Amino acid sequence: MESINFEETLKKLEDVVHKLEVEELSLDDSLKIFEEGIGLYRQCSNELNKIEKKISIIIEENEEFKKVPFPHDEEES
């Protein structure tokens, strides 16, 4: 499968949501599109998790800069 960037994946996910909200689809088609959306959601979530791990916050302490890990909720997984 071709690797696509986060923005492209998010756009595809938005298109899936639009189809489910607006189009009149059969139950089978709705389920297929929903499953596609779940896969896209997972790709976006995984990419965001990777990026979050790379983020550092630089804070100033006593005229020195210090890198600390990006704070995040451990409960969200």
UniProtKB/Swiss-Prot annotation:
Coiled coil (UniProt feature): none
Enzyme superclass (EC): hydrolase
UniProt KW keywords: Cytoplasm, Exonuclease, Hydrolase, Nuclease
UniProt keyword Transmembrane present: no
InterPro entries xrefs: Exonuc_VII_S (IPR003761), Exonuc_VII_ssu_sf (IPR037004)
Pfam family membership, one: Exonuc_VII_S
Gene Ontology CC terms, in alphabetical order: cytosol; exodeoxyribonuclease VII complex
EC number: 3.1.11.6
HAMAP family per record: Exonuc_7_S (MF_00337)
Subunit structure comment from the entry: Heterooligomer composed of large and small subunits.
Family, per entry: Belongs to the XseB family.
Protein name, UniProt field: Exodeoxyribonuclease 7 small subunit
Encoding gene per record: xseB
